[in-house]
Design a protein with these regions (language model features):
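Long, contiguous binding/interaction regions
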Residues: 1-169
Length: 169
């Protein structure tokens, strides 16, 4: 399985390395690439691995991001709503889309439980048609999510119906 998580940090190299190290250190996961962009204040990581090892590495990296990234102090050109903005899974080498969808739900549920961060599923994992398009979920970004998340149609798929104070959604 391949995963390309996006983190809302592209400027602080120490924070970037702490997040990326979670992928480097995990057996069964291979870090293929990562790049940061200061203007967008974003880190994009590309990793592959067996689903269980990938899930473990992601949970550690997401935990690190929740701890290190404060969106109340964040600025950048890219729309964002969370310290970890997206976690797309791409089925490769014998993995199916159904397995990718199942993994996205497992990770989302675990993130919400461990870090008290609300999670929205999108694209093929979406729980409703109006959530398939990521732009619709992102509309309002971090600042607007506090009110949006209280609307019944924007109740998170997992986690509390309130924005995490610093990590967003």
């Amino acid at each position: 399985m391949e995963c390309v998580p996006n983190f809302s940090e592209g400027r602080d190299l120490e924070k970037i390395e702490k997040i990326v190290d979670k992928f480097r250190a995990k057996a069964g996961v291979k870090l293929l690439d990562y790049s940061n962009d200061e203007d967008h204040n974003r880190l994009v990581v590309t990793v592959v691995g067996e689903p269980e090892a990938l899930k473990d590495a992601l949970l550690e990296a997401i935990g690190q991001a929740v701890e290190l990234i404060d969106l109340t102090k964040h600025s950048g050109q890219h729309p964002r709503m969370g310290a970890v903005d997206v976690v797309p899974f791409i089925p490769i080498r014998g993995c199916t889309m159904d397995e990718a969808i199942a993994l996205s739900k497992e990770v989302g549920e675990k993130v919400a439980a461990l870090y008290r961060v609300p999670v929205f599923l999108y694209e093929k994992s979406a729980s409703a048609p109006h959530r398939e398009n990521l732009a619709a979920i992102r509309k309002g970004e971090f600042e607007g999510m506090e009110a949006k998340i209280k609307q019944p149609e924007w109740k998170p798929d997992f986690g509390p119906a309130e924005r995490h104070p610093s990590a967003g959604t």
